[in-house]
């Protein structure tokens, strides 16, 4: 539960007061429109009754939406507040067949758990006022992944022939008193629930009694209070109170329909009247009081009608009258708020019978341009005719009202409108997509599509002209598939507005600028690049479009982990290289320095001021500028190569002693050192290999490897001057690194691979190599090049980079690149792997049969893995740093994993909930699901057993491309992996390809049931397949 709260904190918003007629697409478009609502991209939307939970992708978008005072949609005033976190142990089931008993519902949930491979646990079906919907409470929380699996399984496993949908719900803000406690006096119940010492409760927001035996609903101002009340036992007046969580979606349909129009028909007490009047006032505010507003309440006998006036109207005098539809003997009440003297005289506020409204027209829309154009707005009784259903076809009509009454910056787009709606019994229901309009026939919608840059240009530099279209509603379309404007209004007006917009588009020119610098796309999409483009837009009155740069960036951004950080570098700020005739690798250099220091000590030489050992790369900070770091104690000194200080005789003597020492070493140890050096060299070369998916596209997008930037500007704008200014601005941010001197010519293939891998330009200047690019990429490329050129090279091979990675490494290792060795069933290794596999299958144990087990051998990947493991052992706080996990995959991906390990280009395609990495499961029951390991034509499934370096892990979330950031002040920047739940992780996500090592491949298949006589789960000998 804590992990879920952390994942949703600041991005989930609770929406209330939403009419059922509002389509989900309209609501998401509204909250994704930054100018209208202050929001941004919406991650998910879940409707719950007359509201729901809206989850934004960025916390800043949610903050802006909550900070905006008013949100009006479809004529209703929406109420927003931060949403409670998800209830991890509570499920909502919808679409239950009639007569479903609680016991049958509990059995169905347990069947879903069993079919999903999750631990079966007892559950409790809670009393529900709606027969086709119910809540189920579990004793143990479920993770996000578990709930998603249950949701999918519910689509396949029905209840008595009916498909029952399953959904998550947030923590409850309201509780319902059921049973004998529902008849307790409301005032006594209110005082009890607000008494924190007696009930654990707090301030109430509302208290209402549902009809009949459905119970009494108490809504708290804070969800934490409601959940605290549910955890306690309650007694009042000697009777035990039974409380269950309550949501609006559980209320019967007739109550939900009446509630959508405003106040609840069964609401009691002063709070109910107050909230109903506030909701009614929201409608008046939305219409800005243009004309007279008359509403029928549709109340039952004995209830009182209420009318509200909320201050001065915009166009002249306004009267709002609430007709109660009362029988004789009923009374009406009036409430007047706001300054009365502002209109010069007091307005009439009265109640009137609904019969006087029956002769009004159905719907009329007309602009109110003069004060004497006044007219009533009438809404028929909600209870008698039901709610007015509105579909997407009425979106133009919604825009006419909403945009005219939106935020101050959009005033003037459309003139104030006056709406008159007559009795619904007289006119009949409104059909979706078709509305007859009195006085304004032919209301139409038009869509004008354009490029995103052209749309932004119109919004930025022609805002006054757009605002002048007073008789047409203009709704921006900013979706991923289409961009442009939706025009709503009279047909003649829309056609004129469309021609006007097309003429504006004709005055805009579009150009494509090719960027010469490698890595420009990645830089311009970053914060510094965006700031640079904004400055140029303001200077040249233009708009830059970065849509063609989106595919130009590599998979790892500037803020993510540097794959070259494990490569050794030599001391000093310059990138110094070894000479080609060097006789050893890193270990060789260290041994020579040790011998030299020992001889210097014996001779009494003072060599304390020199750095003799290679410095390990320190952990990079957020700026990722390791080239600026210096060794403590030597900040003011320039590094000097050891060979220029030590006397010649000392170097010769040290080399002689080292040669004598190595002549005494066993040949096997020398062979091991040579193999280790070859593995390190292969590791360095493997960083140049591109994943298959990335290799298909040019690294910088566009043609000829150049990034393309789209610019929209006025025709009179000098594009060449803009191009020169852009190039000059980019040149300021270009970083340069020098590697060398190097006696050989750098091969063209090596230069090309470095440019593609790091997004830099590589040029030769004498015997030095110059690397130019943006940010930390030149420094990374320099470290990579130093590691490539360091150590002994076979003179005959030179640089065989044109060959593929596996072929090169296979030649270096003098053996096969990968090997799958089938294990015999009678071996201990086979039995151990199968036993551990079956121990984690849970409910799927009886339905899975192991076909064969193969050992995966990969010497290079194992060496890389061990190096990574040693590094984690030194710095990780959590133990163990390594775990044995499972990874289900498809049959076509098996050869790639065996050859390259768990590469993100062909792994991690089934899930991105906790990040864009490679997913592993603690229990095999998750990996054997068809979603993760679909069977091939023979019915065989592939599940890898892997050693995974989980290290210190943090909470995963959607969109991560690197492990989550640690807390401020920590010596390390990021965690090592991500998980689904910090407390009890069941899913691990890694972001380094060398962080996991496949050890065994288990081929299994589904069977109706396993033989109970076979302890290994194999009903006989495995087939030879």
Swiss-Prot record:
Gene3D superfamilies: 3.30.70.330, 3.90.228.10. It is an enzyme of class 2 (transferase). It is found in: Nucleus, Nucleolus; Cytoplasm. A motif (Ubiquitin-interacting) lies at residues 650-667, 673-690. InterPro entries: Mono-ARTD/PARP, Nucleotide-bd_a/b_plait_sf, PAR10_RRM1_2, Poly(ADP-ribose)pol_cat_dom. Its EC number is 2.4.2.-. GO terms for biological process: chromatin organization; negative regulation of fibroblast proliferation; negative regulation of gene expression; negative regulation of NF-kappaB transcription factor activity; negative regulation of protein K63-linked ubiquitination; protein auto-ADP-ribosylation; protein poly-ADP-ribosylation; translesion synthesis. It holds the Pfam family RRM_PARP14_3. The modification Phosphothreonine is found at residue 101. The modification Phosphoserine is found at residues 378, 423, 431, 663, 1011. Changing residue 882 to A: Decreased auto-mono-ADP-ribosylation. A motif (PIP-box) lies at residues 831-838. Interacts with MYC. Interacts with PARP14. Interacts (via-PIP box and ubiquitin-interacting motifs) with PCNA. This is Protein mono-ADP-ribosyltransferase PARP10. It comes from Homo sapiens. The gene is PARP10.
């Amino acid at each position: 539960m804590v992990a879920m709260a952390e994942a949703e904190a600041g991005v989930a918003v609770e929406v209330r007061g939403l009419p059922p007629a509002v389509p989900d697409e309209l609501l998401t478009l509204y909250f994704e429109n930054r100018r209208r609502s202050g929001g941004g991209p919406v991650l998910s939307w879940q409707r719950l009754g007359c509201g729901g939970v809206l989850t934004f992708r960025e916390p800043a978008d949610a903050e802006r939406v909550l900070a905006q005072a008013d949100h009006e949609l479809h004529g209703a005033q929406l109420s927003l507040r931060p949403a409670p976190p998800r209830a991890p142990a509570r499920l909502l089931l919808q679409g239950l067949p009639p007569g479903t008993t609680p016991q049958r519902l509990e059995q169905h949930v347990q069947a879903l758990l069993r079919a999903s491979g999750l631990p079966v646990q007892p559950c409790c079906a809670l009393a529900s006022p709606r027969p086709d919907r119910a809540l189920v409470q579990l004793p143990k929380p479920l993770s996000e992944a578990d709930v998603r699996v249950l949701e999918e399984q519910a689509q396949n496993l029905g209840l008595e022939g009916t498909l029952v949908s399953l959904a998550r719900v947030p923590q409850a803000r309201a509780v319902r008193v059921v049973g004998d406690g529902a008849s307790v006096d409301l005032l006594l119940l209110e005082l009890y629930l607000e008494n924190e010492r007696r009930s654990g409760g707090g301030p109430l927001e509302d208290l209402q009694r549902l009809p009949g035996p459905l119970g009494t609903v108490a809504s708290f101002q804070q969800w934490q209070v409601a959940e605290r009340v549910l955890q306690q036992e309650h007694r009042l007046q000697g009777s035990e109170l039974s409380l269950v969580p309550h949501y609006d979606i559980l209320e019967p349909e007739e109550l939900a329909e009446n509630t959508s129009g405003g106040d609840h028909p069964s609401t009691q007490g002063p709070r109910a009247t107050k909230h109903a009047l506030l909701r009614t006032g929201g409608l008046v505010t939305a219409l800005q009081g243009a004309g007279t507003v008359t509403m029928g309440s549709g109340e039952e006998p004995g209830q009182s009608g209420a009318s509200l006036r909320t201050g001065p109207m915009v166009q002249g005098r306004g009267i709002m009258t609430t007709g109660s539809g009362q029988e004789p003997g009923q009374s009406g009440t009036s409430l007047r708020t706001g300054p009365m003297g502002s209109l010069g005289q007091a307005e009439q506020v009265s109640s009137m019978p609904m019969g006087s409204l029956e002769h009004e027209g159905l719907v009329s829309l007309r602009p109110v341009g003069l004060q004497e154009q006044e007219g009533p707005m009438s809404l028929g009784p909600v209870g008698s005719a039901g709610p007015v259903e509105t579909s997407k076809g009425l979106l133009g009509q919604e825009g006419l009202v909403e945009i005219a009454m939106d935020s101050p910056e959009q005033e003037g787009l459309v003139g104030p409108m006056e709406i008159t709606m007559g009795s619904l019994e007289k006119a009949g229901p409104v059909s979706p997509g078709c509305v007859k309009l009195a006085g304004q026939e032919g209301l139409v919608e038009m869509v004008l599509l354009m490029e995103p840059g052209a749309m932004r240009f119109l919004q930025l530099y022609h805002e006054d002209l757009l605002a002048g279209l007073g008789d047409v509603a203009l709704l921006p379309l900013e979706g991923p598939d289409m961009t442009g404007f939706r025009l709503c209004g009279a047909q003649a007006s829309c056609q004129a507005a469309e021609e006007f917009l097309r003429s504006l588009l004709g005055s805009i020119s579009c150009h494509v600028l090719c960027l010469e610098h490698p890595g420009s796309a990645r830089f311009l999409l970053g914060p510094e690049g965006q700031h640079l483009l904004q400055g140029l837009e303001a200077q040249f009155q233009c708009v830059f479009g970065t849509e063609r740069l989106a595919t130009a960036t590599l998979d790892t951004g500037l803020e993510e982990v540097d794959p070259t950080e494990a490569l050794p570098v030599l001391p000093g700020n310059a990138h110094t290289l070894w000479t080609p005739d060097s006789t050893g690798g890193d270990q060789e250099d260290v041994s020579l320095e040790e011998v030299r220091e020992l001889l210097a000590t014996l001779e009494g030489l003072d060599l304390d001021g020199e750095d003799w050992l290679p410095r390990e790369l320190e952990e990079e900070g957020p700026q990722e500028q390791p080239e600026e770091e210096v060794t403590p104690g030597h900040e003011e000194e320039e590094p000097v190569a050891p060979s220029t200080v030590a006397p010649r005789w000392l170097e010769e003597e040290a080399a002689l002693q080292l040669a004598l020492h190595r002549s005494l070493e066993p040949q096997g140890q020398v062979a091991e050192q040579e193999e280790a050096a070859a593995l390190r060299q292969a590791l360095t070369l493997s960083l140049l290999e591109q994943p298959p998916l990335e290799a298909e596209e040019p690294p910088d997008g566009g043609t000829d490897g150049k990034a393309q930037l789209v610019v929209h500007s006025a025709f009179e704008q000098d594009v060449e001057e803009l191009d020169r200014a852009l190039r000059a601005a980019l040149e300021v941010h270009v970083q340069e690194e020098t590697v060398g001197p190097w006696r050989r010519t750098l091969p063209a293939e090596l230069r090309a691979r470095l440019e593609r891998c790091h997004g830099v330009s590589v040029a030769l200047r004498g015997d030095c190599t110059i690397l130019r690019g943006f940010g930390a990429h030149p420094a990374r490329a320099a470290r990579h090049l130093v590691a490539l050129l360091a150590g002994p090279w076979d003179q005959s091979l030179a640089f065989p980079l044109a060959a593929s990675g596996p072929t090169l490494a296979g030649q270096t290792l003098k053996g096969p690149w990968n090997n799958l060795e089938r294990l015999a069933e009678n071996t201990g290794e086979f039995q151990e792997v199968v036993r551990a596999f079956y121990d984690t299958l849970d409910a799927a144990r009886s339905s899975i049969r192991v076909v064969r087990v193969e050992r995966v051998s990969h010497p290079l990947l194992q060496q890389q893995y061990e190096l990574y493991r040693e590094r984690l052992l030194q710095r990780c706080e959590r133990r163990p740093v390594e775990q044995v996990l499972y990874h289900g995959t498809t049959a076509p991906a098996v050869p790639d994993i065996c050859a390259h390990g768990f590469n993100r280009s062909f792994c991690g395609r089934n899930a991105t909930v906790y990040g864009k990495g490679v997913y592993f499961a603690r229990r095999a029951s998750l990996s054997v699901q068809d979603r993760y390991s679909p069977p091939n034509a023979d019915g065989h499934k592939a599940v890898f057993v892997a050693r995974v370096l989980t290290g210190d892990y943090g909470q995963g979330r959607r969109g991560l491309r690197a492990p989550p950031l640690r807390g401020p002040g920590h010596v390390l920047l990021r965690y090592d992996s991500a998980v689904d739940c910090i407390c009890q992780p069941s899913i691990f996500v890694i972001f380094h390809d060398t962080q996991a090592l496949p050890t065994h491949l288990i081929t299994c298949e589904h069977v109706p049931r396993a033989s109970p006589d076979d302890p290994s789960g194999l009903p006989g000998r495995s087939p030879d397949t």
